[in-house]
Amino acid sequence: MSAVNGNDGDSIIAEERLRPLSRDELERYHRNALVPQVGVVGQQRIRASRVLLVGAGGLGAPAALYLAAAGVGTIGLIDDDDVDVTNLQRQVIHITAAVGRPKVDSAAEAIRALNPDVEVVTHRTRLTADNALGLLRGWDVVIDGTDNFPTRYLVNDAAVLLGLPLVHGAVLGFNGQVGVFDARRGPCYRCLHPTPPPAGSVPSCAEAGVLGVLPGIIGTMQAAEALKLIIGGAEPLLGRLALLDVWGGRLREIPVAKHPACPVCGENPTITALVTEADSCTIPQTPGADAQPHARTAEDDSHRQSEGSRPDSSASPRIQGTGEAPTAESAADTVSAAELRQLLAGAEPPALLDVREEIEVTLEPMEGALHIPLREVVARMDELDVACTTVVVCAAGIRSARAIEALRAAGYTGRLVNLDGGVKAWAAG
């Protein structure tokens, strides 16, 4: 196959959009064009393409850099977050000096520095049911680098309604996954997971962590899948989900079939307009979070209502679900940070159990708390005093709720109360 003629396979880029490459472009992308499956025509397709990245974080960062380096003509970025110091461990498009800046601005600056010929379109906004169709319309392919389930489902549904291919990616710990969803010729994300998981049912990267190189691997794989769709003639991960265990050094794939009962792309779809899944999956963004595999994770429910916005807030704090001022004995299953402060100042303060990891406790200690990591809490439950109420805490109230469930299932008979919003809410006052 000629490196000049390129690949004659099915590309998502219409031939009428192609134009000759300049001498400077031929020199810059020479190594791409030397690959027979790419060729000059393939490079023309890359240069003519428009790729939208939803999320400029752990997955979007490497994807954006490699797409820019490859010569993608226009790259779009959607993200409403600012760069946080915790992002720098893996979000390689951002530098230390960018901390506090909008991610889309930091990423756009890095893209332009790498390849000034790339047009960058930025949207510093959160994707919603009201703006998603307008923001996704007109792009050739969408890369999902979202960090929460409501947005992930929204991106999928918008892509289906607009007839766009969607490149999915997710990471957590040592595990990642990548696949291509295109309802016109295969399944969509809802064919695999029809509805979001319950809020708090799975941990976030902020809670469970992620090995910094993993988003780089998965994000780069997403960029490769997008380029394959653009160039044509390749075998995209359509109807297949690649699963990577970087710790075990294993890469495998599972088939994903188009589901006839899929609510958005099935034979009788029930989703014909966009809705945000926030009611069934209240999972706002967490600084430093990344997209997570559905089966293992959910985004950290870390921005719950503050004490000042709670319907039952008053000068005399109440236990949630009661009309009484809090006491250790009357405490319900959940207690706010303000209520916990009142309990601790009382005559019979509750015990505190911190189920976070050691590094979290070191960075932000909870004074007076017994520290037992979540994974050890059942095995060490004899260290707890069943005679008194124990308030269980974690970063945001997710792991602590799971710790309470595990302890009760294991037969613990003492009273257990969850700190709503966790240490984040406690630190916020």
For every predicted segment, state its role.
Residues 1-326, 330-331, 357-359, 371-374, ...:
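Adenine nucleotide-associated cytosolic modules
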